[in-house]
Amino acid sequence: LKYGDIQLSFLKPSDARAAFETGAVDAWVIWDPYSSAAVAQVGARVLVDGVGAADNYNFYIATKPYSEHHPDVLTLALEEIRINDRWIESHLKESAAIVGPQVGLPDDVAETALGHYAYGAQLLTGDVVVKQQKMADAFSDLELIPKKVSIDSVVWHPAH
């Protein structure tokens, strides 16, 4: 399929799940924990997981003025995230028992979703910036975003 062969519906996850369950949409592109919930609770099957097609990253963001005036806080926050990541990764069951109720999922589904994540927050590498730029350019070419953006211009580069 090409982009022009499909009709996109931009829905928030809860609305998208309802549309998927009722057959209002034929397919659903979604991330964890929603994908794990759809497989476990709705009987959905994963058609493509994105491995090799698109890398999935999570980003922590701050305003430019904040990052310029408080780099020490951001550095500390990044280290604390790494510490928490290590704990979560080595205590998936306990983490799922905490996260599951917060997102309205059974512990086993939350544990499956947590098991899919890549842990270990790090600063953006040049490789990640290049990949994100390619994606941003594709979105711009498809007119999914209103104008071209420069990914590198918004990446935090702390002073060493």
Identify what each model region corresponds to.
Residues 137-160:
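Conserved C-terminal helix/tail region of periplasmic/extracytoplasmic solute-binding proteins
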Residues 63, 125, 156-157:
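Residue-level signal for threonine
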Residues 38, 55-57, 117-118, 155-158:
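Short secondary-structure boundary/hinge segments and terminal tails
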Residues 3-4, 21-22, 83, 122-123:
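Short, contiguous strand/loop micro-motifs
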Residues 14-101:
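Pocket-lining segment of extracytoplasmic ligand-binding domains
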Residues 8, 32, 51, 112, ...:
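Proline- and acidic/polar-enriched loop/turn elements at helix boundaries
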Residues 68-144:
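Secondary-structure end/capping motifs
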Residues 1-12, 22-26, 107, 145-152:
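A local structural motif
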